[in-house]
Structures are given as structure tokens and as C-alpha cells.
Amino acid sequence: MGKLTILVLVAAVLLSAQVMVQGDGDQPADRKAVPREDNPGGASGKLMDVLRPKKCVLYPWCG
């Protein structure tokens, strides 16, 4: 009975390895699939955006 269990486990591992190699389920997503416009200036643009005062109609009271 122990040999049968080991045989079944080895078969399951081999089949899962075959599926991983043949399938494309683990391919990384394309980096340019969704363009990100939330930070077009890069790190320096993000820093300048933090340093820049926020647009506020009542600037002295914006805090």
C-alpha cells in the first residue's frame, strides 16, 4: 500500500510539472498593458508634486 501511495504522489508531481511547463498560466503580465499616468514625471516629479502647494481656493485656510 505504501508503494502505491508513493507512485500516485510521484505521478501527481510529474503531471503538475508538465502542466506548468506547457501551460502559460505563469507568464508575467506585459508591463505596458496598462499605461500608468499617475506619475508621469517619475520619482523627481513625484517629489516636486509633494513639495508643491495643493490647489486650494482658500489657500491660507487649507492648512
Curated annotation (Swiss-Prot):
Residues 1-23 form the signal peptide. Disulfide bonds: none annotated. Keywords: Amidation, Cleavage on pair of basic residues, D-amino acid, Ion channel impairing toxin, Neurotoxin, Secreted, Signal, Toxin. The modification Cysteine amide is found at C62. Residues 28-39 have a biased composition (Basic and acidic residues). The cysteine framework is C-C. This is Leu-contryphan-Tx. It comes from Conus textile (Cloth-of-gold cone). The lineage of its organism: Eukaryota, Metazoa, Spiralia, Lophotrochozoa, Mollusca.
